[in-house]
Amino acid sequence: MRIMVHDYGGYSFPIQLSRALSERGHDVRHVYSKSVLAPQGSLQRKQGDPESLTFKGISLSYIIDKQSYMKRRRQEIEYGRLLAEEVKAWKPDVVLSGNTPLDTQKLLMKQCHALETNFVFWIQDLYGVAVNRILRKKLPIIGSIIGSYYVNLERSLLRNSKDIILITEDFKHQMKEWKVREDNLHVIENWAPLEDLPIRTKQNDWAKKHKLDQSKCIVYSGTLGMKHNPSLLLDLSVRFKEQKDVKVVVVSEGAGADWLKKKKLEMGLDNLLILGFQPFDQVANVLGTADLLVAVLEPDAGSFSVPSKVLTYHCSGKPMLLSVPGTNLAAKIVKRQGSGKVVEPFETEEFVNQAEHLIRDDIALKKMGRNARAYAEEAFDIKRITDKFESVFG
């Protein structure tokens, strides 16, 4: 079977899926954007890969501007046209597309239908729901018009997909509300590539390079966008400002990271270190540097997003502290597995208090870390995961 896996963000776990599918004899082309600001995986062939696995990055003239709605939309449409051309040229039997803006997804689906290629919509976030909620807050009048357009577009695309993969059972309620056919729905939870994320100690070259190997480190790694709350990371830095042995490390880029850089200078927060996205081969070292890993998600975002960084965190064997709605799948996993603590997003003081308590409790941290890795080793079996995707493709 010729399978095109389109992962707009270029993340690590879909790459692992593409590799696993190719090892089963499928011709696989892994397509991604080279113009999006995101923590991408290793988007290239490795020694021993089957010849049937290829990678294709699609570039625009400029990095996609997430802060300007009109410019961003134009860029996403341009990307969609280039992606459609790639599908037309390669002629896959099936296209699996995730992490994809709806304007792009629309053009991709249109091309798939023209070629009678099966289109599988891989829902990582309820994009239309997210846009609707965010824009209604920012632009009360026009935002509601734009938001309604994207909700309707997402619903239409889902209804016209051959199959739909949901990353959580929690999304089924929205599918029912949109009258999406239930027999088209398949739930496959996200994962992280365990083989690429070995356990590392703080005594690693990356930590030493950044002079973190002798400090207690609270680390945030990943996207810091509109559905996140960077002020919580600032609050952590303020709380630990006088505790010289504690560093708050943020590995991210974009608007959230830029805001933190500005606040760091204004407030003289020498304990706050803000770094850009690191090469994928350094991610294990970044996470290994942490004594405590943190993830944040705004209250509204809990219903349309699941922070995949939490799954990556589990591979590291390090404990975590989440400011995430308790109903979110990531929160449920952490609470069920005992791999960290979860605080509701509006409980800012409790979040900071928990961090201050945990960073000094080595026994609790070690136990949570062991639980985290144990969950990853049990849940992230790529053979079992690939079986599920193959059953969807038919």
Residue ranges with predicted function:
Residues M1-D49, F240:
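N-terminal subdomain of nucleotide-sugar transferases
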Residues S12, H228, F277-V286, L293-H314, ...:
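Nucleotide-sugar-dependent
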Residues I63-Q67, T117-V151, E195:
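Acceptor-binding helix/loop patch of EC 2.4 sugar-transfer enzymes
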Residues K106, K110-A114, Y127, S144-L166:
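Membrane-proximal helix-turn-helix segments that form the acceptor-binding/catalytic region
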Residues D170, W191:
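Carbohydrate-associated surface elements
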Residues K209-H228, L234-S237, V249:
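Conserved donor-binding/catalytic core segment of Leloir-type glycosyltransferases
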Residues V249-S252, A257-A284:
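Nucleotide-activated donor-binding/catalytic signature segment of Leloir-type glycosyltransferases, i.e.
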Residues E350, H357, A364-E378:
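A short, well-ordered alpha-helix in the C-terminal region of glycosyltransferases
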